[in-house]
């Protein structure tokens, strides 16, 4: 039973990444090592973020919720956008190729570093726990999030982007950066359950994805 539970969690977490890699055409471009390079960049960016947070922002230990402090901590996630831009700027090719390489490499590195060990240790435990199913589902939401963020970075860094599109792209980037902060605040204020919080994150990420896709199609059509 425990091995079956671990297999379900592992498949739910990792197979969407494999399917995305195969179906997006990245395998035809031999982009595996490009994705690995994106993952290495992810590790470097996360190390810089941790050092910055540990130096300038103390850990919140309960009591009154520090709204301003948590907002400032969330602002550090701008470094992810900078890292994604760095990855895309070092890859030649079409826009969708750059976006998928950066997003898939970034999301896979996060999956391995933040969820691999908890799944291996926890999902193989004696007792069944829904939190590992939730963790696996959340990894799929993260994949969509990084695809969305990469598309936004690609659009905003186009030198020929029409000025009419720029405010919309910047707004979507702002929402992507502070989405986790907003969700955490709602969970804290309204004491949302784990499934409710996961559903809310999925809905918000889906809305951002649809908005970004519509804007991406408009930008590509205008500049084609």
From Swiss-Prot:
UniProt KW Nuclease keyword: no
Keywords, sorted A to Z: Cell membrane, Endoplasmic reticulum, Membrane, Nucleus, Transmembrane, Transmembrane helix
GO biological process: multi-pass transmembrane protein insertion into ER membrane; protein localization to nuclear inner membrane
Predominant cellular place of this UniProt entry's protein: endoplasmic reticulum
Gene from which the chain derives: Tmem147
Tissue expression remark: Expressed in cerebral cortex, submandibular gland, hypothalamus, pancreas, liver, and ileum.
Name the UniProt record assigns to this protein: BOS complex subunit TMEM147
UniProt keyword annotation of Transmembrane present: yes
GO MF annotations in UniProt: ribosome binding
Membrane-side (Lumenal) residue stretches: 59-66, 125-129, 188-194
Family affiliation: Belongs to the TMEM147 family.
Signal peptide: none
The organism's place on the tree of life at top rank: Eukaryota
UniProt subunit comment: Component of the back of Sec61 (BOS) complex, composed of NCLN/Nicalin, NOMO (NOMO1, NOMO2 or NOMO3) and TMEM147. The BOS complex is part of the multi-pass translocon (MPT) complex, composed of three subcomplexes, the GEL complex (composed of RAB5IF/OPTI and TMCO1), the BOS complex (composed of NCLN/Nicalin, NOMO and TMEM147) and the PAT complex (composed of WDR83OS/Asterix and CCDC47). The MPT complex associates with the SEC61 complex. Interacts with CHRM3, CHRM1 and AVPR2. Interacts with LBR; promoting LBR localization to the nucleus inner membrane. Interacts with DHCR7.
Entry's localization field: Endoplasmic reticulum membrane; Nucleus membrane; Cell membrane
Pfam families: DUF2053
Functional note: Component of the multi-pass translocon (MPT) complex that mediates insertion of multi-pass membrane proteins into the lipid bilayer of membranes. The MPT complex takes over after the SEC61 complex: following membrane insertion of the first few transmembrane segments of proteins by the SEC61 complex, the MPT complex occludes the lateral gate of the SEC61 complex to promote insertion of subsequent transmembrane regions. Also acts as a negative regulator of CHRM3 function, most likely by interfering with its trafficking to the cell membrane.
Gene Ontology CC annotations of this record: endoplasmic reticulum membrane; multi-pass translocon complex; nuclear membrane; plasma membrane
Transmembrane segments: 1-21, 35-58, 67-88, 99-124, 130-155, 165-187, 195-216
Entry membrane topology: Multi-pass membrane protein
Cytoplasmic membrane side: 22-34, 89-98, 156-164, 217-224
């Amino acid at each position: 039973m425990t091995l079956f539970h671990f297999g379900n969690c592992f498949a739910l977490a990792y197979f969407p990444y494999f399917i995305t890699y195969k179906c997006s055409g990245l395998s035809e471009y031999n982009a595996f090592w490009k994705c690995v390079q994106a993952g290495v960049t992810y590790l470097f960016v996360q190390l810089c973020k941790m050092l910055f947070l540990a130096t300038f922002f103390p850990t919140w230990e309960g009591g009154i919720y520090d709204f301003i402090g948590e907002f400032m901590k969330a602002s550090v996630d701008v470094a992810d956008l900078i890292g994604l831009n760095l990855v895309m700027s070092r890859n030649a090719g079409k826009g969708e190729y750059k976006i998928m390489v950066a997003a898939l490499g970034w999301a896979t590195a996060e999956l391995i570093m933040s969820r691999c060990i908890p799944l291996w240790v926890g999902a193989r435990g004696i007792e069944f726990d829904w939190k590992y199913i939730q963790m696996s589902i959340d990894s799929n939401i993260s994949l969509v999030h990084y695809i969305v963020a990469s598309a936004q970075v690609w659009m905003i860094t186009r030198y020929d982007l029409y000025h009419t599109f720029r405010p919309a792209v910047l707004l979507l980037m702002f929402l992507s950066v502070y989405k986790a902060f907003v969700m955490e605040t709602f969970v804290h204020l309204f004491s949302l359950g784990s499934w409710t919080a996961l559903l809310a994150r999925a809905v918000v990420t889906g809305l951002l994805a649809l908005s970004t896709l519509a804007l991406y199609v408009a930008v590509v059509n205008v500049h084609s």
